[in-house]
C-alpha cells in the first residue's frame, strides 16, 4: 500500500482499545479527508476533551482541491493540506492544548509490517488516516490490528465483500 498517511495518537499515555465516540460517514462525495481526520480524533478522545478549534481547523484546512470546472472542494483534500493539518495537530499537542501527536508519512515511509510506523502507532492505541486508491484517491481510518488483521473504517459507505481489505501481518 503506497499512499500518503499520517498517524494520530495521544501523547504519552496508553489508550484503551475502545472507541470514545461513534464514527461518522461522509456527508458528500468529497469529504473523506476531513471525515477521516474527525473520526480519528473522535476515536481517541471523549467529546468533552475535544476543543472546538480542532474541529474548526480540520474543516478549514481540508477540501482545498478544485474540480475541473473550478468549483472549490469538489475534488477533495490534497496531500499538502493533510500534511499541513498533521503538522498543526502536532504543534497543538506540543503546546499542551490536546494530548495528541501526529506524523505525516509519504513515499517509502508508508508501508505495513512489523517495523512500520503505522503498525507501531496502531499497536500503541493510535490511529492512522491513510490515502488509498479505489477508483479514485480516498482517505480512510485505520484503528488497530486484531488477530493479525488491520481494522479499517471506510467513511464513504459500508464495504462490499469485493472491496473488503484484509491485511495479514
Regions of interest found by a model, annotated:
Residues 2-21, 62-169:
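Conserved active-site-adjacent core of cysteine acyl-enzyme catalytic domains
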Residues 26-27:
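Conserved, non-catalytic sequence blocks in retroelement Pol enzymes and Pol-derived host proteins
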Residues 32:
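Active-site-proximal loop/helix segment associated with metal-binding centers of metalloenzymes
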Residues 36, 56-61:
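Short, conserved active-site loops that position catalytic residues or coordinate cofactors/metal ions
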Residues 36-44:
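Buried hydrophobic packing segments
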Residues 44-45, 90:
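A broad structural signal for alpha-helix termini and local helix breaks/kinks
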Residues 45-57:
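Short, well-structured active-site flanking segments
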